[in-house]
């Protein structure tokens, strides 16, 4: 059960003390307090952990400071979409809103190469009105002999250039606790010119200790990709690890499943789960068409597979697109064959916008018929 307190509740007040004293007297019930501090208000939630079936919602709602009460199911307790759940399905970071009603495009380099490539990519994004990007500094690879990223050496110039070209958020994968500290230090040294969304890749979806560590910090939001060899339920519970440790600013990423049933694409496209994840949880849903398709193959109509798939999923309500571009794919250190060209960026963005408008029209249509 979750007690949602009135906004800006003073935790030093007598009424709050009265509430906590009452909760402390509940046998077999433990409490966990979570606070979200926004620009205009502070929101406090108290999680009651244990056998709460005997607790009456009306009685709990009548307690001091309590504005609403949510009875949660066993699964996805924090991030789940429960009955009569008024909690928001969005969050803001660095002035960018991430929610189940928004769409953000994160185009960029799968792996950071030289500084010129980074600058060319970021300049193109700025010139096309974008404020988010992807930049891979740490690259987990299947082969121990493959390039594994420039690591902390590239962070200063990536962050400096991101600030120069107005990037508000960079999606960046980490694979170890030390990477989190390196990102913090590099941001501090460069004057924090941009923000970072930490990315947990498919290989680390069940690295539970890493999930706990990332979940305990709340300065960076998290993009968690679905594990490529596990069920959707297992991946959603991985996201719950993050949230249960305190970080609720989580985006769930679909990137295709590893199976030969996806041939000739790199992975089997699992984007039909976009509406499923939105129905089960309050997380925004990201799709990664580049790592699903893995090639620049085109249909007879001339449209690239990666663009067809992106459009299909945006029309189904996806909230974030993580896509590979590169100024010179032949020189890319990772995944060059699947990267789109910088000159294709305006075309890609316009195609995404067409798909988004189609989705909004579909929602409008549903609402109109629901009223009739």
Label each region the model flagged:
Residues 93, 206-325:
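Catalytic alpha/beta core domains of metabolic enzymes, predominantly
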């Amino acid at each position: 059960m979750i007690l949602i307190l009135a906004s800006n509740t003073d935790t030093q007040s007598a009424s709050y003390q009265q509430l906590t004293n009452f909760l402390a007297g509940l046998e077999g019930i433990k409490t966990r307090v979570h606070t979200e501090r926004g620009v205009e208000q502070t929101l406090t939630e108290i999680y009651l952990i244990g056998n709460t079936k005997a607790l009456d919602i009306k009685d709990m709602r009548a307690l001091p400071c309590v504005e609403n009460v949510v009875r949660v199911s066993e699964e996805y307790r924090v991030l789940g979409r429960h009955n009569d759940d008024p909690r928001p399905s969005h969050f803001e970071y660095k002035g960018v809103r991430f929610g189940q009603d928004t769409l953000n495009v994160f185009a960029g380099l799968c792996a950071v190469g030289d500084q010129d490539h980074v600058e060319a990519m970021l300049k193109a994004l700025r010139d096309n009105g974008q404020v988010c990007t992807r930049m891979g500094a740490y690259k987990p690879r299947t082969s121990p002999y493959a390039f594994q990223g420039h690591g902390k050496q590239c962070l200063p110039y990536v962050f400096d250039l991101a600030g120069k070209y107005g990037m508000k958020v960079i999606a960046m994968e980490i694979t170890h606790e030390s990477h989190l500290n390196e990102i913090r230090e590099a941001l501090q040294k460069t004057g924090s010119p941009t923000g970072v969304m930490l990315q947990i890749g498919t290989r680390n979806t069940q690295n539970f200790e890493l999930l706990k560590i990332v979940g305990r910090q709340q300065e960076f939001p998290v993009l968690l990709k679905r594990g490529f060899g596990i069920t959707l339920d297992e991946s959603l519970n991985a996201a719950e690890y993050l949230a249960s440790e305190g970080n609720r600013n989580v985006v769930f990423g679909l990137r295709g499943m590893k199976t030969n049933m996806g041939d000739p694409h790199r992975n089997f496209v699992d984007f039909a789960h976009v509406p499923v994840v939105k129905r089960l949880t309050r997380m925004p849903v990201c799709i990664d068409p580049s790592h699903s398709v893995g090639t620049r193959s085109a249909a007879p109509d001339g449209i690239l597979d990666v663009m067809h798939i992106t459009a299909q999923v945006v029309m189904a309500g996806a909230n974030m697109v993580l896509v590979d571009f590169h100024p010179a794919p032949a020189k890319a250190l990772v995944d060059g064959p699947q990267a789109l060209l910088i000159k294709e960026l305006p075309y890609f963005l316009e195609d995404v916008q067409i798909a988004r408008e189609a989705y909004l029209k579909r929602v409008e249509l549903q609402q109109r018929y629901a009223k009739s």
